[in-house]
Amino acid sequence: MGFVAICSASEGFIHPGLLHSREDIARMKAGVARGDGAIHDGFEMLVKSPYSKADYRMRGPVEEWGRAPNINTGQAQEDAMGAYQNALMWAITGRKPHAAKAIEILNAWAGRLKKVSGIDGVLASGLQGFKFVNAAELIRHTDAGWTEAEARRCEASFKNAWLPTIEHYAYFANGNWETAALQTKMAIAVFCNDRELFEETVRYAVNGCGNGSIPHMIVYPTGQCQETTRAQHYVQLGIGLLTGAAEVAWQQGVDLYGWNDNLILKGHEYTAKYGIGEDVPYRHYLDRTGKYGFGGRNNYYTKISTASRGNFWPIFERPYQHYAKRRGVAAPYSGRVVEQKRPEGQSRDHIGLGTLTHYRPRIAATKPARVPGVPSGLVARTTEEGIRLTWV
């Protein structure tokens, strides 16, 4: 059982409080103003992206989009990047055209989208929804000129069009589907000031029955992950999205990063170590669905997959900066990947840009900004000894 502090319901949420706090924005601004160093290099990665331009040409909105079958998928993916990256450009530079572009995209999609669909709809909503919500959070809480009525319409869109697809996670699937859902549900909860939804996501993160909860994503204390046997790009997708949820939780005073002896870090270290060419321990594992792993229907998942070994997605900077710089916890293999890939870019699946948004020049151990309050994620179970309460 781990312990995590959270504010009481009456205290509300910190805003902006998803991937970026006011302190984070100030740190980015200062790093860019210096004109050199890692943050500046990360900013150049943002600037050169076509999705960061104030004259980005919106491809949507649409009434429905989804995956498998792909329906207007490119429109949603590209406009999600356009909204988030223009919102980030605005927050850092203060240039109004970027704010106006992000607002244009957010308002257009909020006014038209009715459904996220498809067999892979959980992934669709979880991956792109996270970018849309982060864009909305930045714009709403940085004096960008977005009216409260417009923000409320966006709230309704997140609740009515995006959330239903991810509401029940994906018990039947590999873990990356659920971590996609987890990060976006948590982000929607904060943006909409929905304490009940936030609490539900915290409970699922540590007690959920599917492959995307922390103990079922990182399945052994060694750091071996549920999708280690599938492909290295899939395992990176799963743990990378999990840190999206962990960062949102941290901003709100909940330390999922540290849960169960830094289990999320162990997953990243194991994956990074294997990716850079070193040996890691392996044990057979059957996943929560009974389909993937030793003894399952897809029982060819019986060894570490070499697929995509040595290819790294833009996921390592955020957890490395948290553990090594915020908390002073060693993360040597993640650090080697970060040095190899810096400055971190972005992708359609991953929000990325971690060198810009999370780099810290030195160790400065910190705690969540929120003052500790009541326990979060409370679960009651009946045992032979009586009722047992656990929380995070």
Predicted regions mapped to residue ranges:
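Extracellular glycan-targeting catalytic surfaces
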Residues: C7-Y171, V206, Q226, V248-Q251, ...
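Bacterial N-terminal signal peptides
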Residues: M1-A5
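Hydrophobic/aromatic side-chain positions at a characteristic register within alpha-helices
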Residues: A91-G94, A189-N193
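Secondary-structure capping and boundary motifs in well-ordered enzyme cores
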Residues: A124, W177, A231-G238, L263
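Extended amphipathic alpha-helical interaction segments
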Residues: E155-A181, I188, D194-R195, Y204-G212
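Pro/Thr/Ser/Gly-rich low-complexity, intrinsically disordered linker/stalk tracts
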Residues: A365-V392
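Active-site-adjacent structural elements in folded domains
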Residues: P164-A173, S213-A231
